[in-house]
Amino acid sequence: NPPETVGNTAGNLNNSGYFCEYDGKVYFANVYDSDTLYSMDPSEQNIKKLGNASVQNILAGGKFLYYYQTGASGDAGIGALRTVRSFNRCKLNGSDVTVLTRDPISTAQLVGSNLYIMTVDDNGPLFYRMKIDKSDKTELANFEINPASAVNGTIYYNGTQDNHYLYAMDTATDGVSTVWNGNLWYPIVQGDYVY
C-alpha cells in the first residue's frame, strides 16, 4: 500500500469501527444480521453479504479488508463460549480470509502496509505493529495507545499514563513527540485542526 494509506477514520474506529467507506463501497457490520460483514454502494444499493462472521474495527486498503471477528453470525448459548475471536484479512469481496492474530483487539488501524494494533488481555495492554502479511511484529508500547487517528503517516493519540497530552507517532521511524500539553481524549486530526 502507499504510505499515505489509512484504513478508516478516527470517528468510525472510536465508535467500534462498524462502518468503513473505501473505493466507492461502504463496508459495514449489519446490525440486523448479528453484525455480519456486508458491503453496499454509498447510495445504499447493491447490498451484499460478505461472510458469516460478526465483525467490528473494519479497515480497508489496497486489495484487502481487515476486521476483528467477534463471533459467528447467530452465536448463542454454550456455542458462543467456543467462538474464536481473531483479527482477519480478506479480499474486498469477502473471500480468502486469513487470520492475522488471535490477540483480543481493542483498536487497530492500517497505515501504509502496516497494522497498528492495541490489545488488552490478562497480561495488560500491548501496542504493536505488524505488516499486513503477519510478518515483522514489533512491540511499540506496553501501555494503551489508540491508533485510530492517523494522517499522512502519523498516528495522533492521547496520553494514558501520566497525562492526557496529544502525542504524535511518526510511523516511518516509530518516534514519538508531544504535540500539545493539554487534556484531551480520542483526538481526531483533520487538516490543521484537532477535535
List each language-model region with its residue ranges.
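Hydrophobic beta-strand positions in blades of beta-propellers and related beta-sheet-rich domains
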Residues: 1, 37-39, 65, 87-89, ...
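N-terminal "mature head" segments of proteins
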Residues: 1-38, 43, 47
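Beta-propeller fold detector
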Residues: 2-8, 48-52, 98-102, 138-143, ...
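Repeated scaffold domains used in trafficking and secretory/extracellular systems
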Residues: 12-21, 52-62, 102-112, 142-152, ...
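Residue position within the beta-strands of beta-propeller blades
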Residues: 27-29, 66-68, 116-119, 156-158, ...
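Short, solvent-exposed loop/turn segments at conserved positions within beta-propeller repeat blades
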Residues: 30-34, 74-85, 120-125, 159-164
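Short loop/turn segments that connect beta-strands within beta-propeller blades
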Residues: 40-45, 91-95, 131-135, 169-174
